[in-house]
Swiss-Prot record:
Binds 1 NAD(+) per subunit. The gene is novT. This is dTDP-glucose 4,6-dehydratase. Pathway: Antibiotic biosynthesis; novobiocin biosynthesis. NAD(+) binds at residues 7-13, 37-40, 63-64, 102, 151-155, 181. The active site is at D128 (proton donor), E129 (proton acceptor), Y151 (proton acceptor). Homodimer. The keyword Lyase applies.
Length: 336
């Protein structure tokens, strides 16, 4: 199979590319991968260094909104796995234009190219944030989208465009929506790496409000395995939820990170809450479990310890990426 991975130099995209080319994902042996990435601040070619010399890998630097480039790159592929997105909620509140451009308009450009070249599958990677907050219970795939942040609204627009392309043009589209991710190579503005690297630098960790907002957490390797199952076996025109089932408040998460780093509560600093901060997200994952046999393999406690160890051992990777403003300001979107 020849797949085009957009945003493949980012956190989740690069994990998917590395695992695919190493043959550790189901049915990935022999896959040829092209990565298309603009290399914005959160994209990093070092994330792809472990597989950069493989013959079945190609990297193209470019913008998914560039119609001519996208049309040229898409040609000759069997499928697109579309990770490319602007993902920082706080940045979207301050300036939404780039989020709408990339997450909605960029998706449209890719869908048009996929239709022209008659690709066999388009997997659109999305987020639980498109549903907005849910006080109890869990959203299923039939729940209506009701995003609150501009980031989530732009992602929802991309989701709806992708599904509309299936219904209108017959393109084989599948949408995945996932809970928060964590693991190696995550940009240090995000909650877990921000907290972890702050503690390693002797700086306090900033917790929004009272710290009672709740999120579900999934290791990035489990997310990518689920995406591969959807790529190979998901039903066209469907949405699949991907989640880990480990739900924590931000304070509970901070406690586990501090424990893993050998630090105490004096390292916590409460900061003003984000405008329109969703209190809780939760996804029902029955569909992907029953149809595709997915279940997470990485226990959160084990994965968190391994993640903290990775940041401890890879300061040379994250230190150049981390600005003083990120260390002292508010945490970014938790796990995208």
């Amino acid at each position: 199979m020849r797949i085009l991975v957009t945003g493949g130099a980012g956190f989740i995209g690069s994990e998917f590319v590395r695992a695919t080319l190493r043959g550790t994902l189901p049915g990935s042996s022999g896959t040829q991968v092209t990565v298309l990435d603009k290399l914005t601040y959160s994209g990093n070619v070092l994330n792809l260094a472990p597989i950069a010399d493989l013959r079945n890998y190609r990297f193209v630097r470019g913008d998914i909104c560039d119609q001519d480039l996208v049309d040229d790159v898409v040609a000759g592929h069997d499928a697109i796995v579309h990770f490319a997105a602007e993902t920082h909620v706080d940045r979207s509140i301050g300036s939404a234009a780039s989020f709408v451009r990339t997450n909605a308009m960029g998706t449209q450009v890719l869908l048009e190219a996929a239709s022209r070249h008659r690709l066999g599958r388009f997997v659109h990677i999305s987020t639980d944030e498109v549903y907005g907050s849910i006080p109890e219970g869990a959203w299923d795939e039939e729940s209506p989208v009701a995003p609150n942040a501009p980031y989530a609204a732009a992602k929802a627009a991309g989701d709806l465009l992708a599904l509309a392309w299936h219904r209108t043009h017959g393109l084989d589209v599948v949408v995945t929506r996932c809970t928060n991710n964590y693991g190696p190579y995550q940009y240090p503005e995000k909650l877990i790496p921000l907290f972890t690297t702050n503690v390693m630098d002797g700086q306090q960790v900033p917790v929004y409000g009272e710290g009672h907002n709740r999120r579900q957490w999934l290791h990035v390797s489990d997310h990518c395995r689920a995406i591969q199952l959807v790529l190979l076996g998901g039903r066209a025109g469907e949405v699949y939820h991907i989640g880990g089932g480990t739900e924590l408040t931000n304070l509970e998460l901070a406690e586990q990170i501090l424990k893993s780093c050998g630090a105490g509560w004096d390292m916590v600093r409460h900061v003003p809450d984000r405008p329109g901060h969703d209190f809780r997200y939760s996804l029902d994952t029955t569909k992907i479990r029953t149809e595709l046999g997915f279940s997470p393999r990485v226990a959160f406690a084990d994965g968190l310890v391994e993640t903290v160890e990775w940041y401890r051992d890879n300061r040379a990777w994250w230190e150049p990426l981390k600005s003083p403003d990120e260390a002292t300001g508010s945490p970014g979107d938790a796990g995208r």
